[in-house]
Each structure stands twice: as structure tokens, then as C-alpha cells.
Regions:
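Membrane-spanning beta-strand positions in outer-membrane beta-barrel proteins
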Residues: 59, 65, 71-75, 166, ...
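Outer-membrane beta-barrel channels and translocator barrels
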Residues: 55, 67, 162, 174, ...
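Extracytoplasmic gating/loop element in the C-terminal half of outer-membrane beta-barrel translocons
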Residues: 23-35, 202-203, 221-291, 295, ...
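Residue-level signature of outer-membrane beta-barrel architecture
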Residues: 64, 159, 216-218, 284-286, ...
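Hydrophobic, lipid-facing positions within transmembrane beta-strands of outer-membrane proteins
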Residues: 46, 56-60, 151-155, 208-214, ...
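Gram-negative outer-membrane beta-barrel transporters
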Residues: 73-224, 234-238
Length: 357
């Protein structure tokens, strides 16, 4: 409809240049250019000088060959990203008072740590002290003010394929820190007027990663039965990702209901479950004359059938008290705080047949 003319012109011309006026829109939407915004309005806008994200990267490495087929290497990777998006509620003012003491429920201890509270009585008596426009709910402005930094060190041992055998052993130690991982998630700021307090481990931080992979061919190449076999094991381990502890309610009265943390809890202070798996691939190649071959494969994933938990119930309540560097546990149900809520697949085996010609 809007592509057929202009919206809200002065004296509307006729024909293809006709305008869409308020009277045209009235049967479909309410049009008003005057008056205050309805209570509970949520506004979204963009920073006037919004900038696109930028990244600076650097890396350095050294590699040493040992013998004819072995090598070792060490590498360092640095990535600094700036002007990342962050949704900031500009309706909140720093005049809200500091309060402390959230009583525990069902015998839980009280969290007595201080936090800034826009729901305090002083804000109810004098809303303009705490809110730029007390009549609206939120005024979210997308700003390019967040940044992130990544440091990674990689050690690697490698053997090129020779004598029917190859090997790769890799260890990565890394750390990722940022202000905001995703402005559409529960990682929004707990205190919108103290954004520096949000700087912590990134959602993608993973401190340790180990991979061991090998390929072994059958040494009996002249045997019709034992030749053509190939065995490829992979062992992998990843340490857990951080997760945010959430109160599950708007405890600080800022009209944001999904991002509040227990008072005093740093962002991403929980540590998620680690991952470990042993996978294998076994294949047998049979030549069918000079131009064709048949290959049977059997692949197994998570052969040890280890339970690799994926996510944690991070809603722990407003009265959750230190220590905050907690982990998930299988001792409680998924509906309880810190209970595991999902797991990755158990042991899987798949068979395949491939004909090449």
C-alpha cells in the first residue's frame, strides 16, 4: 500500500502521485500526532552515530619439524572486537537508591548484597528522579558501545601419514571476555546505568579444548582378508561454557523481567558442563577389478556412552547467595535451580556402504 504514494502529504495530488492521509489510515490503525504515549509503551531506537562492528586480529606461531614426518607447533591468536551492539534502556536514571537484603524463601539464606532499585519507595514518590519518562515502560536504544577480546594459545603435535599411520594431537587454552554477548538474550545488563559491571567472561568462553585423532591402516596389505582396513579414532574434550545466574523476576524495578541476576552475582559466573567423547571409524575397502571398489564403513559416536549434559537451569531466585561460581548438578531435577535441562546424544552407531567406479 505504501509503495503507491506518499504518507501524510499536505495537499494530496491525484493519480499515481496521490498521498496516503490520516483519513485513509483511520479504518485500519489509530493515527495521532499529539498527546502522550500510552502507559506501558516500549520504544526502540538506534544510536544516531551507530557504527558497524570492527575487529583487529593478530597471530604468531612457530613450527619445528622432527625427523621426516613429525612436527610440533605453538600458536597464539588475538582478536579484539569493538562497536558491538548493545541495547541500553535510556529511560532509566542513576537517581535510583541502593538497597540491600532480599529474604530467602523456604529456608534459603538471605542475599544481603546491595543493588540499585528503581522500584524503591522514593522512585514511586518521585518518578522523575528515577525515570526519564515515567509514563512509558522502556526506551531501548541500540548502541555500538560493547567490545570483546579473545586470547588463544594452541599447541599441536602432528605426524604426516607414512608407514600406514598419521596422528594429530591438539590442545587449546583460551579466554574470551566481553560486555554483551547478545542483546536479544538474558545477557542484557542487570544495571543499565552501570554497564562497566557487565564486563565478564563471554558466553563463548571455553578455557580448555583437547583433540586427539589418528588414522591407522592395516599393515597386512598382501592378505586378501586383512588388507584394506582403516581405523580412525578421535578423542575430544571441551571444558564448559559460562552461564548467567538469573533471579527469574524483576527484582530491581527497572521494567526488565528476564535479565535480573541475584544481587552481587557477576555476569556469567556459572560454569556449564564439560564435554568428552570417544568416536571411531572403521572401514574395509574391497577392490572389484581395476576400476571399481566397494567400501564398508562403521562409525561410532560417544562410544563410551558418556552422559554429556548440555544446558543448566540457571533461574536460581533473587535470594541466591554467594558463592556464585557454581556448576550444574544431576542431583536435582531439571525444574530445580542448577539442574541439568538437556543432554547431547548418547552412543550412536551407523553403518555405510559405498561403491566407487
Amino acid at each position: 500500500m505504501f509503495s503507491q504514494g506518499k504518507i501524510l502529504c499536505g495537499a494530496p495530488p491525484q493519480g499515481a502521485n496521490a498521498c496516503i492521509t490520516q483519513s485513509d489510515l483511520a479504518p485500519f490503525v489509530t493515527v495521532s500526532n499529539t498527546g502522550s504515549l500510552p502507559p506501558g509503551t516500549v520504544l526502540f531506537s538506534g544510536q544516531p552515530d551507530y557504527r558497524n562492528p570492527q575487529a583487529q586480529q593478530a597471530s604468531v606461531g612457530i613450527e619445528r619439524q622432527i625427523g621426516k614426518s613429525w612436527s610440533v607447533s605453538a600458536n597464539y591468536i588475538y582478536v579484539h572486537t569493538t562497536h558491538l551492539p548493545w541495547a541500553v534502556d535510556t529511560n532509566l536514571l542513576p537517581g535510583a537508591p541502593m538497597v540491600s537484603g532480599i529474604p530467602g524463601a523456604n529456608g534459603l539464606p538471605t542475599n544481603g548484597l546491595p543493588f540499585q532499585d528503581w522500584g524503591a519507595p522514593v522512585c514511586s514518590k518521585n518518578p522523575s528522579q528515577c525515570f526519564a519518562d515515567p509514563g512509558i515502560l522502556q526506551n531501548n536504544e541500540y548502541e555500538s558501545i560493547a567490545n570483546a577480546v579473545y586470547h588463544g594459545g594452541i599447541l599441536e603435535l602432528r605426524k604426516r601419514f607414512s608407514s600406514g599411520f598419521s596422528l594429530l594431537a591438539n590442545y587449546t587454552y583460551s579466554k574470551a571476555v566481553d560486555d554483551s554477548t547478545d542483546f536479544n538474550s538474558d545477557y542484557a545488563a542487570f544495571n543499565e546505568v552501570d554497564l562497566r559491571a557487565e564486563r565478564s567472561l563471554s558466553d563463548f568462553d571455553q578455557r580448555h579444548k583437547v583433540v586427539f585423532a589418528a588414522v591407522v591402516e592395516s599393515p597386512w596389505q598382501r592378505s586378501h582378508i586383512l588388507s584394506g582396513f582403516e581405523f580412525a579414532p578421535i578423542v575430544s574434550y571441551n571444558s564448559g561454557h559460562p552461564f548467567n545466574l538469573l533471579a527469574g523476576a524483576d527484582i530491581n524495578g527497572d521494567n526488565h523481567f528476564t535479565n535480573d541476576r541475584p544481587p552481587g552475582a557477576p555476569r556469567n559466573s556459572g560454569l556449564g558442563p564439560s564435554y568428552a567423547a570417544f568416536d571411531i571409524r572403521l572401514s574395509k575397502r574391497i577392490n572389484l577389478g581395476e576400476r571399481a571398489n566397494l567400501q564398508f564403513t562403521a562409525e561410532g559416536f560417544n562410544i563410551a556412552n558418556r552422559t554429556n549434559y548440555a544446558t543448566v537451569n540457571n533461574i536460581v531466585g533473587a535470594s541466591f547467595a554467594p558463592p556464585f561460581n557454581v556448576r550444574g548438578t544431576s542431583a536435582v531435577s531439571p525444574s530445580q535451580p542448577l539442574g541439568y535441562t538437556a543432554a547431547l546424544p548418547k552412543r550412536e552407531i551407523q553403518l555405510g556402504l559405498r561403491i566407487g567406479f
